[in-house]
């Protein structure tokens, strides 16, 4: 079964491909099939993920899965949330994972409350007008470190410390990260939903 991943993020694609492989599902990055990205005008992860999934399904005629994920920092009242990917741009930096981490560390200097949640919402649709989308959510609580730690992963992985594991996501072996990350948790739920409802 082929499913479009409604993302151009190669890090997400690699993570999700590895986790979906046992199902016999081939995930194809939308950028390999068409140009352009869905608008993400909403203030919740689930609405943006649904918008992206419907857009990719409409453009390709294939089932689609979209992820909308982000960091919700306690000190910032849950922000940056759905604007996580563009976090650094409000501080004059060009959009990139590296600049996002730099901006976050700068903004968190001297802040005692370092609690944060990483949230991932996956939405799957069989077609652009699917009335019954699959929805899976994963959430992990952690703390923002004061400096980068580790070289694995992408995004905020080098500064997202998980106390019960004693490591940042960037310090973890990929298999450990998949088992404990927000995206890993949401993906495991989505795999079960796809297995139950889409794979025959």
Curated annotation (Swiss-Prot):
Its EC number is 3.6.1.66. The keyword Metal-binding applies. Mg(2+) binds at residue 68. GO terms for molecular function: dITP diphosphatase activity; ITP diphosphatase activity; metal ion binding; nucleotide binding; ribonucleoside triphosphate phosphatase activity; XTP diphosphatase activity. Pfam families: Ham1p_like. It comes from the Bacteria. The keyword Metal-binding applies. Binds 1 Mg(2+) ion per subunit. InterPro entries: dITP/XTP_pyrophosphatase, ITPase-like_fam, RdgB/HAM1. It is an enzyme of class 3 (hydrolase). Its cofactor is Mg(2+). CDD domains: HAM1 (cd00515). The active site is at residue 68. GO terms for cellular component: cytosol. NCBIfam families: RdgB/HAM1 family non-canonical purine NTP pyrophosphatase (TIGR00042). Belongs to the HAM1 NTPase family. Pyrophosphatase that catalyzes the hydrolysis of nucleoside triphosphates to their monophosphate derivatives, with a high preference for the non-canonical purine nucleotides XTP (xanthosine triphosphate), dITP (deoxyinosine triphosphate) and ITP. Seems to function as a house-cleaning enzyme that removes non-canonical purine nucleotides from the nucleotide pool, thus preventing their incorporation into DNA/RNA and avoiding chromosomal lesions. This is dITP/XTP pyrophosphatase.
């Amino acid at each position: 079964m082929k499913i479009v991943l409604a993302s151009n993020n190669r890090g997400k694609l690699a993570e999700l491909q590895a986790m979906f492989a046992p199902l016999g599902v081939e995930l194809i990055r939308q950028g390999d099939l068409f140009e352009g990205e869905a608008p993400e005008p909403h203030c919740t992860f689930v609405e943006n993920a649904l918008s992206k999934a419907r857009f990719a399904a409409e453009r390709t005629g294939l089932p689609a899965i979209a992820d909308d994920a982000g960091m919700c920092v306690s000190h910032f009242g849950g922000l940056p949330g759905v604007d996580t990917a563009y976090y650094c741009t409000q501080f004059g930096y060009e959009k990139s994972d590296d600049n996002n981490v730099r901006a976050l560390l700068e903004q968190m200097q001297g802040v005692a409350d370092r609690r944060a949640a990483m949230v991932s919402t996956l939405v799957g649709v069989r077609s652009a007008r699917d009335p019954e989308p699959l929805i899976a959510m994963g959430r992990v609580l952690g703390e923002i470190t004061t400096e980068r730690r580790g070289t694995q992963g992408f995004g905020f992985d080098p500064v997202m410390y998980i106390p019960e594991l004693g490591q940042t996501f960037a310090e973890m072996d990929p298999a450990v990260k998949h088992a404990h990350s927000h995206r890993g948790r949401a993906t495991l739920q989505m795999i079960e939903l796809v297995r139950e409802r889409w794979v025959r």
